């Protein structure tokens, strides 16, 4: 069990908002480009309001001090996208090991799962134990 599964979830009520144009991000979104099932392309680049506020502050600081800026690679993602990316990563790892796999027996390959879970959280639909990136307001 991952450490975040032991931490009680307390939603702070902060809403998801669109990332403002003062912040730069990839367009199209890298996962959308791979075929990830975003239902609405206009809702891809969203974060909790407090996260946006902090990123704007850091970005302003970087620009003022060094003429650098943040380039956002990823943001909130729905569970369907998490599942798509997890399965994609799993398939790629299986291909590297020359393993033919179906997702019905995904747990039969713990060594592959371990590699994938270094970068991707398992796409759990359990509201008591969601993946760590997920905003519960959208479960």
What are the residue ranges of the model-derived segments?
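Conserved small/polar residues in nucleotide/adenosyl-binding loops
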Residues: 137-139
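Short mixed-charge
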Residues: 99-109
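Surface-exposed short loop/turn segments
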Residues: 107-134
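Charged, often glycine-rich, active-site loop that binds/positions anionic groups
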Residues: 79-99, 116-117
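Active-site acidic/histidine clusters and adjacent loop/turn architecture
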Residues: 44-77, 87-92
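N-terminal regions that are enriched for targeting/export leaders
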Residues: 1-22
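Acidic/histidine-rich, surface-exposed loop or edge segments in extracytoplasmic proteins
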Residues: 25-44
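Phosphate/nucleotide-binding catalytic core
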Residues: 71, 76-80, 90, 120-124, ...
